[in-house]
Amino acid sequence: TAAAVGAVGVLRHDPMAMKPFIGYNVGDYWAHWLEMGEKLGDKAPKIFNVNWFKQDEEGHFMWPGFGDNMRVLDWIIKRCEGTIDAEETAIGYLPKKGDINLEGIEDEVTPEILDKLLYVDKDLWKKEIAEMRRYYKEDISDKGGHIPAALIAQLDKLEERLNR
């Protein structure tokens, strides 16, 4: 939206794409959603992280995008239904090789490209954790806000898994 315009190429922390519309302490906002998740229990929506824009060494997008995104969404739906397994990693569950339908795009998404798409770059994730800690401190805590302890605990657990 026009309300969310920012500098191009600069990481913008925007919780749930709601930053322009959160009219109170973001820590309270997060706490509300954490509480909602607890109330919903097993009925809470599953959360998935997808990077449609991962690039190779030459700056080319590795995933074809557009309608082919449905191939990943199909895997997500199957995970939600409990009809397909996943590989547990430090950052969560990833598709097992062969579980994303690549029929018809084998020339675009080769086994080597798929390996790169599913690769967990621990150093990159550790940098992300450091950036999140900086964001929590400088952009929220130092400005009078607060962070729910559960979010800090999740960062700590993620960092611990990455260090194994």
Residue ranges with predicted function:
Residues T1-R164:
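Conserved NTP phosphate-binding and transfer environment spanning the P-loop NTPase/kinase superfamily
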